[in-house]
Amino acid sequence: MGHIDLTAVNADLGRNAPALVQWALGLGKTSIVTTNFRPFEAVILHMVTQVNPKVPVVWMDNGYNTEATYRFADEVTKQLGLNLKIYLPLRPRAHREAVEGPTPALNDPRHAAFTAEVKLEPFARALRETAPEVWFTALRATDT
């Protein structure tokens, strides 16, 4: 497939999210949906799995999620039959904290290395291993 005219696609499908999902999955490209299992994430997970329940759902579980997040992840995974692929840091939380202490504060110079280890490396590994050509996410304008 050559060039995709996204302006034309957006003009045709507009804000019809289910139609956009159908169109994107209809391209026949390797697809993933990423999630952090915030409450509103269920919407995009539901939309994508309604079109193709086999799409890999990639979750970077940094080991620092709340009990509510883990319960929500389990509930949504079961209800939607998600093809969940969990990516964890290479070093477990208990090991990291035993050697380096608790999570460094945002203004602590060690925080950059912490972020690289528990968030960025698992994310980069997930993208390498899944090699998506179509990527769904519920990123909001207020997210960073």
Where are these regions (language model features)?
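ATP-dependent adenylation/nucleotidyltransferase module used to activate substrates
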Residues: 1-144
